[in-house]
Amino acid sequence: MIEDNKENKENKDHSSERGRVTLIFSLENEVGGLIKVLKIFQENHVSLLHIESRKSKQRNSEFEIFVDCDISREQLNDIFPLLKSHATVLSVDSPDQLTAKEDVMETVPWFPKKISDLDFCANRVLLYGSELDADHPGFKDNVYRRRRKYFAELAMNYKHGDPIPKIEFTEEEIKTWGTIFRELNKLYPTHACREYLRNLPLLSKYCGYREDNIPQLEDVSNFLKERTGFSIRPVAGYLSPRDFLSGLAFRVFHCTQYVRHSSDPLYTPEPDTCHELLGHVPLLAEPSFAQFSQEIGLASLGASEETVQKLATCYFFTVEFGLCKQDGQLRVFGAGLLSSISELKHALSGHAKVKPFDPKIACKQECLITSFQDVYFVSESFEDAKEKMREFAKTVKRPFGLKYNPYTQSVQVLRDTKSITSAMNELRYDLDVISDALARVTRWPSV
């Protein structure tokens, strides 16, 4: 006990050491960029002594920020990864007692450690609001573009813990949803996997899945939270593979709220709320599938760009376009198929090329966005796909392990004996509970 107290005191003294630190970092020349970074200092109660900016000498699109601050070691450790998520840190000049010794973690890409950290990456969309490609069905429709901008602003203003804004959908949007809902429901009994068919009626009962009603994301999120611990977070558009998979690690599904253009209800060049609600949500309500999705997300945290791309491709050919075997027949569990009438028919037509799911092969397959896939991968079951992905995840090169804590909705970085011992103690308790339960069942089999 004395030794523990001594160690705690040393750790406390160590973390409370303060000093004057100079940081230089570069930012993209965009609206609000500096405000986001300064907010990091404010929220971590760091006193800024001096700040100035200058045009970057390396890139015209960037400018450099010089910050002089009074900060503790603990604060420096807290804000450094947050700064790296918004800016490129060029220089840190600090007293020796505040400079953390270099280790392999310095080379690891920033990743969220707790669910609220998703606020730092959920708005890094690749396309924003009314910015539509020229071949988009709504490109020339100014009313539709304004509507898309409205949905984008709602998502960009969302923060973890906020209720998802309720939407009053237009008659045109409801009609578009209704067409998709009606046509897909004709195919589901003969094409969708049994887990999907089991959960869809529950969504009709508790979340208002009907032909004449577009479900509210807040209602859907609350339903999923009770079923599998997943929650919904509104997003303005496409996220990078790294940012999207990061959400899955915390059982957060980034979900669009906008509806595709009404000129072609059966086609969309991008994920819309019809795709999310009809394709993804019913299976996110399935515990085994939810676990599978989260494990792909966890494998992506801190991984290299090459590895993240491989994981994203495996996600694409399972969660988006995966097939499985049930009762001797092929069935669909991929959301991209379950929300596309024509490709759903094609995938089970007997003319599509199918292969057994193998992550090492699937990760090299080209993902097609505007046409049917060249090949579809078949899993024996969700458990089979999960086991194969677990083996694949073991090949991810990271100088640490990760353990998700569902109570705090955070990830524990396992990189030393202390953190690993702590994780083992938690596991030992869980095993004791199961062991005790087995003993009781054996003792009183009729209970």
Curated annotation (Swiss-Prot):
Disruption phenotype: Mice display impaired hemostasis, resulting in a reduced risk of thrombosis and thromboembolism, although the ultrastructure of the platelets is not affected. Blood platelet counts are normal. Defects are caused by inability to inability to mediate protein serotonylation of small GTPases during activation and aggregation of platelets. Its cofactor is Fe(2+). It catalyses: (6R)-L-erythro-5,6,7,8-tetrahydrobiopterin + L-tryptophan + O2 = 5-hydroxy-L-tryptophan + (4aS,6R)-4a-hydroxy-L-erythro-5,6,7,8-tetrahydrobiopterin. Keywords: Iron, Metal-binding, Monooxygenase, Oxidoreductase, Phosphoprotein, Serotonin biosynthesis, Ubl conjugation. GO terms for molecular function: iron ion binding; tryptophan 5-monooxygenase activity. Its EC number is 1.14.16.4. The modification Phosphoserine is found at S61. Ubiquitinated, leading to its degradation by the proteasome. Ubiquitinated is triggered by phosphorylation. The keyword Metal-binding applies. One of its GO terms (cellular component) is cytoplasm. InterPro entries: ACT-like_dom_sf, ACT_dom, ArAA_hydroxylase, ArAA_hydroxylase_Fe/CU_BS, ArAA_hydroxylase_sf, Aro-AA_hydroxylase_C_sf, Aromatic-AA_hydroxylase_C, Trp_5_mOase. Pathway: Aromatic compound metabolism; serotonin biosynthesis; serotonin from L-tryptophan: step 1/2. It comes from the Eukaryota. GO terms for biological process: aromatic amino acid metabolic process; bone remodeling; mammary gland alveolus development; platelet degranulation; positive regulation of fat cell differentiation; regulation of hemostasis; serotonin biosynthetic process. L-tryptophan binds at Y238, R260, T268, S339, I369. PROSITE patterns: ACT, BH4_AAA_HYDROXYL_1, BH4_AAA_HYDROXYL_2. Fe cation binds at H275, H280, E320. Belongs to the biopterin-dependent aromatic amino acid hydroxylase family. Homotetramer. Interacts with DNAJC12. NCBIfam families: Trp_5_monoox. Oxidizes L-tryptophan to 5-hydroxy-l-tryptophan in the rate-determining step of serotonin biosynthesis. This is Tryptophan 5-hydroxylase 1. It comes from Mus musculus. The lineage of its organism: Eukaryota, Metazoa, Chordata, Craniata, Vertebrata.
